[in-house]
Amino acid sequence: MAYQEPNKDGFYGKFGGRFVPETLMTAVLELEKAYRESQADPSFQEELNQLLRQYVGRETPLYYAKNLTQHIGGAKIYLKREDLNHTGAHKINNALGQVWLAKRMGKKKIIAETGAGQHGVATATAAALFNMECTIYMGEEDVKRQALNVFRMELLGAKVEAVTDGSRVLKDAVNAALRSWVANIDDTHYILGSALGPHPFPEIVRDFQSVIGREAKQQYRDMTGQDLPDALVACVGGGSNAIGLFHPFVEDESVAMYGTEAAGLGVDTEHHAATLTKGRPGVLHGSLMDVLQDAHGQILEAFSISAGLDYPGIGPEHSHYHDIKRASYVPVTDEEALEGFQLLSRVEGIIPALESSHAIAFAVKLAKELGPEKSMIVCLSGRGDKDVVQVKDRLEADAAKKGEAHA
């Protein structure tokens, strides 16, 4: 299968596009032009590759999780260790690429949105490296949940704006960042943190994150002597770590691809972020994608224990993969993610981010199903330092409830 998405209008099948007001159209067209020029310039990629090596610490290891594999007794599990990047997650791959692009465009200021704070920290880091002014928009709810990352961003010289609109989470931060971009287009570049938004953002983010899958593909061959793994697993909020792992394998049809969505308290409750399980097509933040919405087309609130997954939409390329049945998207509850978080910590000595824990939880199930002859690559998108206090509080609260129930 030859895969050449997006088309010239930024559509992945029927998803994607550019649904933006006239005031933003100039900016996205300027961005696309600058991006095409950078793609054609070998020095751009050479400089970026050097930064990825020397500053970020790439390539990240592909680690055979022997203890986890033996513990489950199923398929071999290989972890793509994006948690070992500088700043602790995959987000730096995109932030660095986009800040370098903005610098080439002659922009002076960087703005970004963040949920868990990882993209905010990565953007503030890249802005500090390139000596650019930086403002990060973050939902007030997430500011509370991720106080440590807020301090990190400020330490790196960024200004953090707490967004008090709506439910004060990621989608509200995106809205605030887009408004700010409209007002300051001439000297400002907006760095979207996931593979969504108006074209060319999903393509740019995918291309910068595809380093994950390209490395993993070669590393798997070098480690095993086999051509391809049987499956890929990655968590999906907006979907940038997943698209980064999946895209280099999209034409390899023998490789099954699984995105794990946040099922929160369960997909049959109102508290989840399982967009492809429960959503339907709609326009959000400049792109046609699957969206959680009510019967009147109003965007529903997304919910997840993990701040990085509670987005009510999903990148248009994931909607397309789902539509053409190239990838499967499976819901994973808070409870299951917490089990994955503890299991990986206990058996491998690796504390995963809550986002990545959704992928670990499903990988455990899938490994049992596939059996010991098969193998999979799981994207460990980030480290769990930022989540340890939240998990501690949650587990203590759960233990207290159980204690009361037995009393």
UniProtKB/Swiss-Prot annotation:
UniProt keyword list: Amino-acid biosynthesis, Aromatic amino acid biosynthesis, Lyase, Pyridoxal phosphate, Tryptophan biosynthesis
CC terms in the record's Gene Ontology section: cytoplasm
PROSITE patterns documented for this protein: TRP_SYNTHASE_BETA
Keyword Disulfide bond: no
Source species, domain of life: Bacteria
Swiss-Prot/TrEMBL catalytic activity: (1S,2R)-1-C-(indol-3-yl)glycerol 3-phosphate + L-serine = D-glyceraldehyde 3-phosphate + L-tryptophan + H2O
EC number: 4.2.1.20
Pathway: Amino-acid biosynthesis; L-tryptophan biosynthesis; L-tryptophan from chorismate: step 5/5
Single annotated GO MF: tryptophan synthase activity
Cofactors (names): pyridoxal 5'-phosphate
Modified residues (N6-(pyridoxal phosphate)lysine): 91
Gene3D superfamilies tied to this protein: 3.40.50.1100
Claim: Lyase is one of the keywords in the record: yes
Stated role: The beta subunit is responsible for the synthesis of L-tryptophan from indole and L-serine.
Family, per entry: Belongs to the TrpB family.
NCBIfam families in UniProt: trpB (TIGR00263)
Subunit architecture: Tetramer of two alpha and two beta chains.
Full protein name: Tryptophan synthase beta chain
